[in-house]
Amino acid sequence: MPAPPREARRERVYAARAPRYTLLHKPMKQLIAISAIGSDRTGLVYDLTRVVVDCGGNILESRMTALGNEFAMLMLVSGNWHTMSKLEGELTKLTETSGLTISSRRTEARPPRTDMVSYTVDVVCLDQPGVLHALAGFFSSRGIDIGDISTRTYAAAHTGAPMFSVYMVVLVPTRVHVAALREEFMDLCDHMNLDAILEPFKA
């Protein structure tokens, strides 16, 4: 027996609202990490980003800076499987034509860590060998991961003395007693004559 008109209309409405899933409905995004370095010149950033865009990639994160006469770039790019395959081939071609040394590696999104809290570290001191090594050793020996590092040297504004600065983001496990960690960190900085701040990360 056919359904009454009202019920038939209701079935058609539900069918229209129901999502239609296919294998091509939502392609899974993949990630690739890219590093590139080459002699500094105008257009390096354009050359690399053009290849990424032309292949359909999306730049999620990047770090770029001049190091002496070299220019270095780090990128995290997302895209579907076809984008990744095409991009790897185009990066090989770019290496041959641009003078850049390029390496790439497939990767995955880092899962959120609920057992760690981000802290920032700011250090300024007279330039001296071994500062970054000492800081890295301090945190490593306590099971604390380093999420980000940026350093630079510069001349002090009034005296012209060579200065060194460090900015770090460290991931402190929740099991670590932060007050004790800060005290130990300040003891190290006092011993090395470093001006330093350790404080919670502010997004």
What are these regions (language model features)?
Residues 11-27:
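Short, Lys/Arg-enriched N-terminal segments with co-localized hydrophobic residues
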Residues 27-203:
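A conserved regulatory-domain signal marking ACT and ACT-like small-molecule sensing domains
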